[in-house]
Amino acid sequence: MSHDIKRIVSHYRKKFNTNDPFVIADQLGILYQIGALKYEGCYMFLKNHRYIFLNEDLPPHEQKLVMAHELGHAILHRKENCYFIRNKTLLLNSKNEIEANKFAIELLLPDEILNDYIESEYTVEQVARITGYYQKLIELRLKA
């Protein structure tokens, strides 16, 4: 199933007037918990409820990125359980992981901010350093 991720993200950003994945999850009734995990995060669909779990050892900025990624799974792949493993997920060619990454970076790096960087002629590497997001995610965002 193909998703128009830009349109979907825009819908939720406008509906809830935020790009904060924690607020959007709250508004959608998606429960999340931060605790000790062996991986960065995971999304689970159990007994018709959606849950996101985040690793407590991640810095807040990375928790927000992982939350946005898992929120992407919750919205785009509602009934599939997914685990976020940093070093592998960003390199996987899995359609679901790529879509969740696109959802996350589309949500966290809106057009107006990205366009400011482009107009100022920042390189992808510079945008990654400024925003704190992986360079591969910035590249993925620019392809959107």
Locations of regions flagged by a protein language model:
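Active-site hotspot residues in diverse enzymes, especially metal/ion-binding acidic/histidine motifs
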Residues: 1-144
